[in-house]
Amino acid sequence: MLGKLDWSAIPFDQPIPLIAGAVVLVAILAVLVWVVVKGHLPYLWHEWITSVDHKRIGVMYILLASIMLLRGGSDAIMMRIQQAVAYQSQGYLPPEHYNQIFSAHGTIMIFFVAMPFVIGLMNLVVPLQLGVRDVAFPTLNSVGFWLTATGALLVNLSLVIGEFARTGWLAFPPLSGLSYSPGVGVDYYAWSLQISGVGTLVAGINLVTTVLKLRTKGMNYLRMPMFCWTTLASNLLIVAAFPILTATLAMLLLDRYLGFHFFTNEAGGNVMMFMNLIWAWGHPEVYILVLPAFGIFSEVVSTFSGKALFGYRSMVLATMAICVISFMVWLHHFFTMGAGPDVNAIFGIASMIIAVPTGVKIYNWLFTMYGGRIRFATPMLWAVGFMVTFIIGGLTGVLVAVPPADFMLHNSMFLVAHFHNVIIGGVLFGAFAGFEYWFPKAFGFRLDERWGKLAFWFTFLGFYVTFMPLYIAGMLGMTRRLQHYDVAAWRPWMLVAAAGMAVLTIGVICQIMQLVVSIRNREALRDRTGDPWDGRSLEWATSSPPPVFNFAFSPDVRGEDAYWDMKTHARQQSFEHDAPEYHDIEMPRNSPTGFICAFFATIMGFALIWHIWWMVILGGIGAFATFVVFAWRDHDEYVIPADEVARIDRINLEERRSLVSMAGVV
C-alpha cells in the first residue's frame, strides 16, 4: 500500500535532522495558522498563488530562492564547522550524514537558489525593459514556477522522511546506482531535479519567446538593454542544455527502477557516458547562471556611472560568443579520464578562449566607469566587488583549464574554491545587486542603504576569508568531501575558513535586517518617481510598483538607452499630451493551473520515490487532467476598461509631474 515507506523513514535515531525537521515543520504550521487566523488566505490565493502576472511570479521565484538560501547556507555552515573540528577525530557529523549535507548543499544552491533567483529577476524585469505587458505565455510561467517549488519541496522532505543522496550534487555512477545507493536518497535527488527541470525548461522557452517576439515598437535587437540580451543568451542555453539533463537523469532512473544498464560497465554500459552527458549540461549551466548576472552588472554600472554602457555592440557579441563556446568546453571537468593529450589540448584551449569574451566585458565595465560620475550605492558596491572577485575566479579557472595543472588539482579543495569564486562572486553578487537595484521597482520603496552596505562588506570580506584558504589547502593536497582528516598542515586553513563562514553569516543576517528595517521605514524610503536611481531603460518609465498592465501606452523606442533618451529629449509620453486617448487593455486572467499541476506533481514525485504505484497513477492522471482542462478554456483574458487605465495612469502622472517640477527639471 505504501511501497517502501514505513516508520523507519523517520530519522528518530539522528537528532540533528530530526530537530531541524521539527523546527521547519513548526515554522510552516505557525505561518499557515497565522495566514488563516488573520484572514490572508483569500488574498494570497487570488493575488499570488493563482497569479499569472510576471512581476508577482518573479517575486515568488526570488522568495523561494531566499528561503532555500537559508537551507543551503545552513548546510554550508555545518560543513565548515565539521571540517574545522574533524582533525584526527570524527567531528560531530557521522559520515553518512555529512555526505548527505554536501550533496544537498550543492543541489540546493545551484538548482533552488541560483536558478530561481536569476529567473525571478528575469521575470520581474525583462517585460518591463521590453516595454510589454507580460511574458509570451503567462499561465505556463505560473506552471514553471510551481514545478520549481515542487522540486524544492521534495528536497526538503528528504530532511525528515527518508534521506537525501550521498553522491555529491551530480550523482556520478556507479555511486548513484542501486549497488552503492540502495536507499531513496538518489531517487529524491533525481525526481526533484526532473520535476524542477521541466519548470526551468518551460521558463526558458517562455523568456526566449518573449524577447524574440514581444518587444515594443522601435525596439530592434540592437536597442535592447544588455540584461535582455543576457536573458536571451541564458535562456537559449536552458532550451538547449536542460533536455540533456532530463535525458541523463531519465537513464539513471531507468537503471535504478527497471534494471537498465546505461551506466553499468560490467553489464555493457559506460559510466563515462554519464560524465560526458552531465557535464555537457553542467558547463552551460554555469553560463546560464552567470550571463544574467553579467546583464545585471551592465545595467548597474551604466546607471551608477551616469554613462551609456561602453562598447554596447561588443558586449552583445561577447554575450553570444560565450553562449556558443560554453557548449565546447565540458571535457575540462574530467581531463583525468584518459581521453589523451590531443583531446585534452583541444578542450583546454577552448576553455582559455572562453575567457576572452568575458575579459571584453570586464574592460567595458571599467571603461564605462572611467570618466563617469560614480555613485557608490549598494548595487554599485556589489558590482565592483564582483569585478575583483570574478577576475580571481576566472584566473584560477584558466589555471585548471591547463591539463597538466588539472591533473594535480582535480577534485581538490582548490577546485571547490574556484567554483565558489565564480558562483558566489559572479552569480550571487549579481543576484544581490539586482535585488537591491530593482527592489524599489517591485515594491515601491528603496532598501535601507546603511544595512545594505554592511551586508555587502561582511559578505565580501567573509567570502575571501572563507574561500582563499581553500585554494591553499587544495595546493597542499587536500581533496574535497573529506568528513575527517589527519594532516596537520590542513587544519589552520580549515579553522580560518570556518571563521570566514561566521563573517559570511553576519552578512546574511545584515541582509535580513536590511529588509526588516526597510519594511518598517517604507514610507520614508518610498519611491514616488518610479525612477529612484535615474535609470536608463524602460522599467523606470512606469510607476513603482508598476500597474498590472505595466504601461498605459506602448513606449516608442528611438535609441539604445530608451528611457534616458526620453528624459534627455523631453519626449516622455507622460508629458506629450494633456489628455491622451486611453484604450481598453486586455490582460491574462489568473489561473490555478500551475498550483494544481504542482500539487499533483508533488504527489507523483513522492510516490515514485517511495514506489507507491497507486499514488503515482493518481498524481499522473491529476496532472494530465489539469493540462486538458486548461487547454480547453476559451476565456483566459479579462479587459481593464479605458476609464480605469486612465485613472491609474493619471494618478501616476500627476505625482511624477509634481515631483519633477519640485526638482526644477520641468
UniProtKB/Swiss-Prot annotation:
GO terms for MF: cytochrome bo3 ubiquinol oxidase activity; cytochrome-c oxidase activity; heme binding; metal ion binding; oxidoreductase activity, acting on diphenols and related substances as donors, oxygen as acceptor
A Gene Ontology biological process term: oxidative phosphorylation
InterPro entries associated with the record: Cyt_c_oxase-like_su1_dom, Cyt_c_oxase-like_su1_sf, Cyt_C_Oxase_1, Cyt_c_Oxase_su1_BS, Cyt_c_ubiqinol_oxidase_su1
Residues holding heme b 2; high-spin: H418
Enzyme Commission code(s) on record: 7.1.1.9
Keyword annotations: Cell membrane, Copper, Electron transport, Heme, Iron, Membrane, Metal-binding, Respiratory chain, Translocase, Transmembrane, Transmembrane helix, Transport
Catalytic activity: 4 Fe(II)-[cytochrome c] + O2 + 8 H(+)(in) = 4 Fe(III)-[cytochrome c] + 2 H2O + 4 H(+)(out)
SUPFAM superfamilies reported in the protein's UniProt record: Cytochrome c oxidase subunit I-like (SSF81442)
Protein topology in the membrane: Multi-pass membrane protein
Numbered residues of crosslink 1'-histidyl-3'-tyrosine (His-Tyr): H283-Y287
Pathway the protein contributes to: Energy metabolism; oxidative phosphorylation
UniProt keyword Mitochondrion, yes or no: no
Family: Belongs to the heme-copper respiratory oxidase family.
PANTHER family, alphabetized: CYTOCHROME BO(3) UBIQUINOL OXIDASE SUBUNIT 1, CYTOCHROME C OXIDASE SUBUNIT 1
The protein's name in its UniProt record: Probable cytochrome c oxidase subunit 1
Organism name: Bradyrhizobium diazoefficiens (strain JCM 10833 / BCRC 13528 / IAM 13628 / NBRC 14792 / USDA 110)
